[in-house]
From Swiss-Prot:
Active site: 147, 171, 243, 246, 269, 278
Organism field: Pasteurella multocida (strain Pm70)
Gene behind this protein: xerD
Protein name from the UniProt record: Tyrosine recombinase XerD
Main location: cytoplasm
The keyword Cell cycle belongs to this UniProt entry's keyword annotation: yes
Superkingdom of origin organism: Bacteria
Localization annotation: Cytoplasm
Length: 297
């Protein structure tokens, strides 16, 4: 069987078994395609390579300038692939078992100050239907901490404006209920009344925030919109990421004393350690303020 066919069998297996998102599956496919392209040049296959071949491949990637984070993601995909090939008896061993992960730098998530968030949220011209949509989306994102993928795929049946809640189906098909808040609720109502009908052009759509072609927005389109408003707000776009408002949501909650387990629940994190990064952000902020304003800082 060809290597490409084995990869597709593997991806189908983990998509069903692990309920991974399409974005994760696409990342795995991209990484593993790079592996089999390298193997072809070495006249090797997924079945006859050994651990030294994998180490050589990873070493070449690092020498080519790929970041440790990219290499760690690739290694994760490779481990899952070879575990699958071993389990399904395509191989008699797992050559990835002896590989060590590259050491990753501890990075704090990028976030905005409360004033920067206010400036960003006030940037759209709400008299324009498209920008009214963007305003409602950003308000909802900051109010709930949704992932961008969760936001753009949000459907009408999963939002209850009267109760002020959204039902989110997140990673691993895990469901959570998140309150919206008054400000976001107001702007969603405004969009539903005055913006959404204009964007739909008489068509029907299940998604709350359709594109100007009445389709579901892509993550890339929303990220482009965020950067547009950041530039209008004099915010350095190099300090941003697509999840900047999600990070701001969590960081500002922690700064104001929110219980970490509540933040974990709202974000949909399965592990509290993932949420604890925001306590480090808060500590870094306090340290910065102390150094800036204390006479002996």
């Amino acid at each position: 069987m060809k290597d490409s066919a084995l990869i597709e069998l593997f991806l189908n297996e983990i998509w069903i078994e692990k309920q991974l998102s399409q974005n994760t599956i696409a990342s795995y496919r991209l990484d593993l395609t790079a592996l089999i392209q390298w193997l072809e040049k070495q006249q090797l296959t997924l079945i006859n390579l050994d651990a030294i071949d994998l180490q050589t491949f990873l070493g070449e990637r690092l020498n080519q300038g790929y970041k440790a984070t990219s290499t760690a993601r690739l290694l994760s995909a490779m481990r899952k692939l070879f575990q699958y090939l071993y389990r399904e008896k395509y191989r008699t061993d797992d050559p990835s078992a002896v590989l060590s992960s590259p050491k990753l730098p501890s990075r704090l998530p990028k976030y905005l100050t409360e004033q920067q968030v206010t400036d960003l949220l006030n940037s759209p011209d709400v008299d324009i239907p498209l920008e009214l949509r963007d305003k409602a989306m950003m308000e909802l994102l900051y109010a709930t901490g949704l992932r961008v993928t969760e936001l753009v795929s949000l459907t009408i049946e999963n939002i209850n404006i009267n109760q002020g809640i959204v039902r989110v189906v997140g990673k691993g098909n895990k469901e959570r209920i998140v309150p919206i808040g008054e400000e976001a609720t107001y702007w969603i109502r405004q969009f539903m009344l005055y913006g959404r009908p204009f964007l739909l052009h008489g068509q029907s759509s299940d998604v709350v925030f359709p594109s100007k072609r009445a389709l579901q927005m892509t993550r890339q389109t929303f990220w482009h919109r965020i950067k547009h408003y950041a530039l209008l707000s004099d915010i350095d776009i190099n300090s941003l990421s697509p999840h900047v408002l999600r990070h701001a949501f969590a960081t500002h909650l922690v700064n104001h004393g929110a219980d970490l387990r509540v933040v974990q629940m709202l974000l949909g994190h399965s592990d509290l350690s993932t949420t604890q990064i925001y306590t480090h952000v808060a500590k870094e902020r306090l340290k910065h303020l102390h150094e800036r304003y204390h006479p002996r800082g």
